[in-house]
């Protein structure tokens, strides 16, 4: 069944345009509250947010919607998405709610949800919510209204949780680390986590003003981090996105490592300690070099649809622990129930500290195949999937690439874009093939 409002990561859009309007968000919270009350008499939800100026307005709308359905609310303030997931589980709440549009610019915002266990919710739950949205509201009477309170030490609790995932016998003393929080949800907690584990911290992207989230900083704009690492002669650079669930890492030389490489490093570190890693989940976008390297070490590799929720579903299906995406969403289910940029960074740094090796040394076995990704903005009403020209050009490209490359064309789950990815042994060929497909889509 097609979902009307939910995309691959909750509900997202431009603030002031449907569905990201205060009236819809109030109705959404009321509908979610009614779904919760089918199985629980007095549910409690936690609400966290990133640093967008619109977060205050949407937080108020959510609070009113939940209270009007007889649901209690706990406000967490600005907090990374994985922090909300952790506290939902730790506080035994019924649901976690995050107000964020992740890596998108400040004009966008969104709403996503976590189960009582701190995991992304399945499609069937989203269908139930959309069905409730189509029904008339049932307002709670005055005696049954929900109540709201704040959890003042939410950030401190999450900081301690992150630190608990780092080995007790190791320290970050002697390391200088540049931390870029994208002027987003981790602007307070990220520098403190690394500082309290012993590192000398240089903070950038940690001065939000409501309008600058993800603007030329963070995981989607790593050049600022690269320049800062070089300028400060730092050992590492850590870049998070607006809600801190994804990671990009830079070494002392300013080389950028993406999620595919870091996923392999996490596997390698565990195998080096004789921990079993029966299998790993990537996505349709994961670089072929990672798959080849893992299979050479006897580790099964499965590709999920793009989106960390689908990686999680495959991990749970196979009962595996490690998975991720090239964008920097990494999952280690023995550490956290969802992708966490801070915890992922700590696991990578732990591998470096424990081995005494640099990132380049740890990843010497993996050389990523050249990949070209082009985003093509769709025209209103454009039905690209039925294009005969696109089908013909795609067949031609796949024939040219053969077994030494891949073509992937998919719609974005969060923006009106079609993403064209070509992977080949040769960078020039990958670029040329991707441009052929992109030009066909643009006609």
From Swiss-Prot:
Cofactor: Mg(2+)
Keywords associated with the record: Isomerase, Magnesium, Metal-binding, Phosphoprotein
Processing after translation: Activated by phosphorylation.
CDD domains assigned: GlmM (cd05802)
Gene3D superfamilies cross-referenced by the UniProt entry: Alpha-D-Glucose-1,6-Bisphosphate, subunit A, domain 3, Alpha-D-phosphohexomutase, C-terminal domain
Enzyme class, UniProt record, top EC level: isomerase
Reactions it catalyzes: alpha-D-glucosamine 1-phosphate = D-glucosamine 6-phosphate
Swiss-Prot/TrEMBL GO biological process terms: carbohydrate metabolic process; peptidoglycan biosynthetic process; UDP-N-acetylglucosamine biosynthetic process
Residues bearing the modification Phosphoserine: 102
Binding residue positions for Mg(2+): 102, 241, 243, 245
Comment on bound cofactor: Binds 1 Mg(2+) ion per subunit.
Pfam name, any one: PGM_PMM_II
Similarity comment text for this entry: Belongs to the phosphohexose mutase family.
Full protein name: Phosphoglucosamine mutase
Species in which this protein is naturally found: Albidiferax ferrireducens (strain ATCC BAA-621 / DSM 15236 / T118) (Rhodoferax ferrireducens)
Gene from which this protein is expressed: glmM
């Amino acid at each position: 069944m097609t979902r009307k409002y939910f995309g691959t990561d909750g509900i997202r859009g431009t603030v002031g345009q449907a569905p990201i309007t205060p009236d819809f968000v109030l109705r959404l919270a009321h509908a979610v509250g009614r779904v919760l009350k089918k199985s629980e008499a007095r549910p409690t939800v936690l609400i966290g947010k990133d640093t967008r100026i619109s977060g205050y307005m949407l937080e108020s709308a959510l609070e009113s919607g939940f209270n009007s359905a007889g649901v209690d609310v706990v406000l967490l303030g600005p907090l990374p998405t994985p922090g909300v997931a952790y506290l939902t589980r730790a506080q035994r709440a019924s649901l976690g709610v995050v107000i964020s549009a992740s890596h998108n610019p400040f004009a966008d915002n969104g709403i996503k949800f976590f189960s009582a266990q701190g995991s992304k919710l399945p499609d069937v739950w989203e269908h139930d919510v959309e069905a409730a949205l189509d029904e008339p509201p049932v307002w709670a009477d005055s005696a049954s209204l929900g109540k709201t309170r704040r959890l003042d030490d939410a950030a401190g609790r999450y900081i301690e949780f992150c630190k608990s995932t780092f080995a007790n016998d190791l320290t970050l003393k002697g390391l200088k680390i540049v931390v870029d929080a994208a002027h987003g949800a981790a602007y307070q907690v990220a520098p403190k986590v690394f500082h309290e584990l012993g590192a000398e911290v240089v903070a950038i992207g940690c001065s939000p003003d409501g309008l600058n989230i993800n603007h030329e900083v963070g995981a989607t704009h790593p050049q600022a981090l690269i320049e800062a690492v070089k300028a400060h002669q730092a050992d590492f650079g850590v870049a998070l996105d607006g809600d801190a669930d994804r990671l990009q890492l830079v070494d002392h030389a300013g080389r950028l490592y993406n999620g595919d490489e870091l996923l392999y490093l996490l596997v390698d570190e565990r195998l080096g300690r004789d921990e079993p890693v029966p299998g790993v989940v990537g996505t349709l976008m994961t670089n072929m070099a990672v798959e080849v390297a893992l299979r050479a070490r006897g580790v099964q590799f499965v590709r999920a649809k793009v989106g960390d929720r689908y990686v999680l579903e495959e991990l749970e299906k196979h009962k595996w622990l490690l998975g991720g995406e090239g964008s920097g969403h990494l999952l280690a289910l023995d550490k956290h129930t969802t992708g966490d940029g801070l915890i992922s960074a700590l696991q990578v740094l732990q591998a470096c500290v424990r081995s005494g090796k640099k990132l380049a040394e740890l990843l010497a076995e993996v050389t990523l195949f050249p990949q070209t990704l082009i985003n093509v903005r769709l025209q209103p009403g454009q039905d690209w999937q039925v294009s005969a020209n696109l089908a013909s050009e795609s067949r031609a490209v796949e024939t040219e690439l053969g077994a030494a490359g891949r073509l992937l064309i998919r719609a974005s789950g969060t923006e009106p874009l079609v993403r064209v990815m070509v992977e080949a042994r040769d960078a020039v060929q990958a670029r040329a093939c991707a441009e052929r497909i992109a030009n066909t889509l643009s006609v």
